[in-house]
Regions:
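Active-site neighborhood of HAD-like aspartate-dependent phosphohydrolases
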Residues: 1-63
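Conserved acidic residues
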Residues: 6, 132, 155, 191
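Short, basic/glycine-rich phosphate-binding loops at helix/coil junctions
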Residues: 58-75, 99-102, 126-129
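Substrate-recognition element of Asp-dependent hydrolases with the DxDx(T/V) motif
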Residues: 78-84, 88-122
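A short, structured active-site edge motif that brings together acidic residues
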Residues: 103-110, 119, 125-143
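Conserved Lys-Pro-Asp/Glu-containing loop-to-beta segment of HAD-superfamily phosphomonoesterases
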Residues: 142-168
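Acidic, Mg2+-coordinating phosphoryl-transfer loop and its flanking beta/alpha structural elements
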Residues: 158-195
């Protein structure tokens, strides 16, 4: 149980690190060789599906197939080159300087080397002492078990996926949803929607 209320529980992909464009780039360059030794690129993004949360719809493949690709991607060296979400570095570092601690809760992978790569990347971008007590779950796993550890604390919980944001309410947390095209059809009276970490800083500072 946390001893301080100056703790922010936060997702990573789509909140701290840019994931969807990074994954799309990886998918589009993924290639194979046919029986004649010719290289081909089988994956194409579907233009009118790019605002969907479900990646299977974006690429016109089955959910089982896309899950295999995501598992491979999330344990690849590409985890070491994810870019920070726009302007997130400025405001996360400022919050840390003001005494806030961040606990990442991310459904990245159960692969230990890939988890270490994620930790290193977050440290490179935001600082080695900003994050603590990493809770890294299997690829795509529900976060209820991790959130349950903070039941009744009233901590802020930053997410980009509506399902996970609402899950925080079950444990007495204060969900904040980072705005993305794929979650704009979601509304909930107890979930705060923000554009970026600047908005979050204003909320935590009592300015919004």
């Amino acid at each position: 149980m946390p001893q301080s209320n100056r703790i922010i529980l936060t997702d990573v992909d789509g909140v701290l690190l840019e994931w969807e464009n990074h994954f799309t780039k990886w998918m589009l360059q993924k290639s194979y060789f046919d029986e004649h030794g010719n290289r081909y690129f089988p994956h194409k993004s579907i233009p009118d599906q790019q605002n969907k949360y479900e990646m299977a719809e974006r690429f016109g493949v089955t959910k089982d197939e896309i899950r295999k690709h995501i598992r491979e991607f999330n344990r690849s060296a590409w985890m070491g080159t994810q870019r920070p979400m726009l302007e997130s570095q400025t405001w996360v570092k400022l919050l840390a300087a003001e005494g806030w601690t961040f606990i990442p809760i991310t459904s990245q992978t159960s692969d230990i080397p890939a988890q270490q790569l994620r930790k290193r990347r977050l440290g490179e971008l935001y600082g080695d002492k900003v994050f603590t007590n990493y809770l890294i779950l299997g690829t795509g796993a529900d976060k209820d078990s991790a959130l349950a550890e903070f039941h009744g604390t009233g901590l802020y919980w930053v997410e980009d996926k509506p399902h996970n944001a609402v899950a925080g309410l079950k444990y007495g947390l204060k969900p904040i949803l980072i705005d993305h095209a794929y979650n704009r059809d979601f509304e909930h009276p107890e979930v705060l929607r923000v554009n970026n970490w600047k908005d979050i800083h204003q909320i935590l500072s009592g300015k919004k």
